[in-house]
Amino acid sequence: MTEKNNHIEDKTVRAYGEQALREEAQAILDQIPFLDENFEKAVDMMYNCQGKIIVTGVGKSGHVGAKIAATLASTGTPAFYINPLDVYHGDLGVMTDKDVVLALSNSGQTDELLRFIPMVLHMNIPIISITGNPKSLLAKYSNFHITVKVKKEA
C-alpha cells in the first residue's frame, strides 16, 4: 500500500497560479477585436434601460450570467438572473417591455434558451446576446449580438 503525498511544492503551485492568470488575461485581451458597434449599442441599451436587465443562460453560461446579474445589481443596475426553464413555472410575470434581456450561450443554439426567446420577442423585450457563434439562431433573433471566442478554459 502506498502513502499519498499530500504536499505540493510551493513553486509548482505558484507556477500553476501564474499560468492560469496569464491564460485568463490573454483570453480577455483576445476579445478586444470583437468590441464593435454592436457592443457599443448593447452597452447603450443596457445603460438606458428603464426596467431591469434580465440575464439568462443554461449550464456554465447560466453560472456566468448569474455572476453578471449579481455584479450589475451590486453596482446599482436593477438586474437578476433567470433560468430559461423557470419561465414555464411562473417567472415570466417578472418581465416587462421596459426590461432588456441579456442572453448568454457559447453555441447560440441552446434548445432551452431558444424556446424562451419567442416569449421575450412576444413581449417586445429587446435581446442582447453574447455567443461564440455570430451565425447562431440566438444571434439572429437578437437586437444586438456580441461575439466572444473562448479558446481554452484556464
Regions found by a protein language model. Name each.
Residues M1-T2, N6, T12-G51:
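An N-terminal, well-structured beta->alpha segment
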Residues G51-A154:
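Glycine-rich phosphate-binding loops that contact phosphosugars or nucleotide phosphates
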